[in-house]
């Protein structure tokens, strides 16, 4: 290996390490701010300190603080008012309570519902996506890959990818439906049980590849291809979860909502 190649590889690894540090740091700052909101240090309606004040408090750059604020905004905990500041609009506990009365549905029933809804969302998103939307999806996908290489059991980027697709449609009803489907997942005891069995990164790696296929279709504005890619992605998830399931479990719903490789309407 030449000296120049070694330098290039060193620079590439350094850049990746720095990106990983940034991702871990903004998540940590976001969690600390969420704790402050939960503990009542900042109440609903309160204005959060400025970027400069938060960066000085935690000893991080203002860029890190900005990313943490975006994280809180995505989670609907704060609202950014241009020219005014960032305000607390909800607490983490209120969001949890809001969805605590949702029924515990089986994972395969949930995946079937997601398959029907999200394939249409992907189709529409392919027609609506802007350059900014594509860039956002790429950033989320890169975060998924980084979390995988770090062997972190963190699937937040997976959720962000699917929610970002719904937001591209600019249809608030679709966004709310998508958010609720994810809450069904978080409330599902059987889903949690199955998820705990996904110990091999191979599964997550395959799903990231599916996300790349979906993104490529959207980037090409190929609505039909985007719909089929999303349908197949969730079909792949169903197949893997079926393999991991205990079919003797009385709550197993895999036979009621079985695999269906055919995309409806094609």
Curated annotation (Swiss-Prot):
Single GO molecular function: DNA-binding transcription factor activity
Classification via Pfam families: FCD, GntR
Keywords: DNA-binding, Repressor, Transcription, Transcription regulation
Lineage top rank: taxon: Bacteria
Presence of the UniProt keyword Transcription regulation in the record: yes
SMART domains: FCD (SM00895), HTH_GNTR (SM00345)
SUPFAM superfamilies found in the cross-reference section: GntR ligand-binding domain-like, Winged helix' DNA-binding domain
DNA-binding region: 51-70
Gene3D superfamilies xrefs: GntR ligand-binding domain-like (1.20.120.530), Winged helix-like DNA-binding domain superfamily/Winged helix DNA-binding domain (1.10.10.10)
HTH gntR-type domain: residues covered: 23-91
General function of this protein: Repressor for the uxuRBA operon.
UniProt-recorded name of the protein: Uxu operon regulator
């Amino acid at each position: 290996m030449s000296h120049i190649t070694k330098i290039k590889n060193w620079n590439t690894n350094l850049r990746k390490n720095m990106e990983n540090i940034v991702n871990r740091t903004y998540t940590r700052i976001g969690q600390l701010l969420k704790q402050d909101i939960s503990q009542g240090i900042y109440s609903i309606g309160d204005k959060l300190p400025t970027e400069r004040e938060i960066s000085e408090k935690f000893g991080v750059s203002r860029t890190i603080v900005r990313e943490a604020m975006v994280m809180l905004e995505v989670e609907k905990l704060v609202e950014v008012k241009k020219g005014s500041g960032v305000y607390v609009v909800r607490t983490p506990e209120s969001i949890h309570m809001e969805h605590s009365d949702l029924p515990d549905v089986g994972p395969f029933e949930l995946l079937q519902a997601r398959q029907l809804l999200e394939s249409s969302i992907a189709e529409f998103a392919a027609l609506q996506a802007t350059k900014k939307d594509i860039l956002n999806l790429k950033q989320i996908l890169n975060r998924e890959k980084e979390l995988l290489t770090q062997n972190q059991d963190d699937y937040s980027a997976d959720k962000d990818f699917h929610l970002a697709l719904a937001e591209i449609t600019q249809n608030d009803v679709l966004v709310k439906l998508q958010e609720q489907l994810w809450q069904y997942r978080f409330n599902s005891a059987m889903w949690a049980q199955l998820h705990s069995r996904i110990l091999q990164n191979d599964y997550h790696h395959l799903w990231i590849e599916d996300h790349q296929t979906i993104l490529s279709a959207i980037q090409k504005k190929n609505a039909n291809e985007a719909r089929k890619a999303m349908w197949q992605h969730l079909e792949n998830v169903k197949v893997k979860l079926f393999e991991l399931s205990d079919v003797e479990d009385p709550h197993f719903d895999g036979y009621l909502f079985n695999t269906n490789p055919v995309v409806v309407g094609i």
